[in-house]
Amino acid sequence: MAQSAGLAALQEREYVAPATEMETNLCKLLGEILHIEKVGVEDDFFEYGGDSLGAIEYVAKAHGMGIEMSLQNVFDYPTVRSLCDFLQGEDKEKVQYKETDFDKYKELFDRNVIKEGEKFEKKSLGNVLLTGATGFLGAHILNELMQKETGKIYCLVRSNKVDDRRGRLREILKYYFGDRYESEINKRIVPIIGDIEQKGLSDEIPTDVQTIIHTAASVKHYGSYSYFNRVNTEGTAHVVEYAKKIGAKLIHISTLSVSGNSMADDFSVYRSDEEKFFDETSLYIGQPLDNVYIHSKFEAERRVYDAMLEGLDAKVIRVGNLTNRLSDYKFQPNYTSNAFLTRVKAILEFGLFPDYLMNLYAEFSPIDKTAEGVIKIAQYADKQCVFHLNSDKVIYFNRFLEIVHKLGISMYVVSGAEFNRALQETIKQSNTEYIFEAFQNDMDKQGKLVYDSNIRIKNDFTLWFLEKVGFEWNETDMEYISGYVDYFRKIGYLEV
């Protein structure tokens, strides 16, 4: 990281020396990471050139020094003094609500129950406004719309120039679908300049729209809450207002992470022996919402439900773990930013697996199947308004290891203590420290990986509905896992 990144700030700062052992160690560590000779306790990590990659290195090396902190802590407390005060003091205030605050939504959630004998009629979506069309899910929803519907698809693209918006959309469609839609751009596929952060969305927003599918969001899990609130929460509020204005149906894409069953900031804080269930009738069940991404998506859902109580026709679809296409295993171009994939790479290349995780499972929701499910729900759902679109064909880790063994990958199941010792050793070598970095936010204070949760996500209602309308998830079997692994080997990401 270049020293010049924060040179101006360095020249103007007043150096404040560290006073404690922890402050001294962290200041020295930051100096090494930022390539700055002398870092004081009041110096802001980001003002002096720090970024997300540097923050990951900061957290990993701090762990190696015995200082436990999370990536989100670095964003919340960017100076050494504020970070040490937090780490040595009381926990920061948690995001809390009262369950009674959500009683007003009961009439909406009561619609999402199985009613034997109920039938659903397919309805045309008409012309569609699609936000997030250049994203992983958005692009595949566009593909489904082109295959299953006949109306125009207006794609909201952030850009200041007409040529840029066309080029950006054309580039992503070519990446996923080759030349299939080249001749349709500016015909059925209409890119329009706009931004969900802008009230009104766009100066050229169409009014001949019957359905809005809102997939645009920032899906990073760490950063400032003001940013996530602006994009995910207020951005959704702007989409809702536009839907109300033109009388369009809204399909809002959310995430199952709002359940609290997620690898958030400091997982050990959230563990509980009290088992809770989160289904299509749930919103707030006392789950942790301190992760900035999850909190912003939770609040975005509230904006949609509030509008529904005022008469808006809307559906909220909470999606699961989006993975490679079923058809050919294609994945998103920015694959290195995918947290699940980062962990898969780390565990396969590490070659060790802790015995205490053998009874857990992983969920793979192929992106093309997920997009198909979104359109099925949009076409057939009537009064029902919340869906959990995640695969029920999970794969247990013991079966996953059997499959990767057959693919020639050596994996050894070891005790938790042995796994932890070996994991700590990875910090000492620059070519293996990425392994520790992949898991650093998933460990409790004893260094144990925590992937279980007291919150159980259920999707019985959605599975019943999807079966009624002719949709079923694929098996997560040898064929799919083999294709998944081979894809990342071919592009050079997996080196096993």
Indicate where each model-derived feature is located.
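A hydrophobic C-terminal alpha-helical subdomain
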Residues: F353-L357, N420-V469
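NAD(P)-dependent short-chain dehydrogenase/reductase
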Residues: A264-F277, Y305-A362, I367-E372, K376
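Phosphopantetheine-dependent thiolation modules in NRPS/PKS and related acyl-activating systems
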Residues: M1-E116
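Glycine-rich Rossmann NAD(P)(H)-binding loop
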Residues: Y48, V319-S327, Y356-Y361, F387-I395, ...
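Amphipathic terminal alpha-helices
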Residues: Y97-K106, T150, Y154-V157, R456-V496
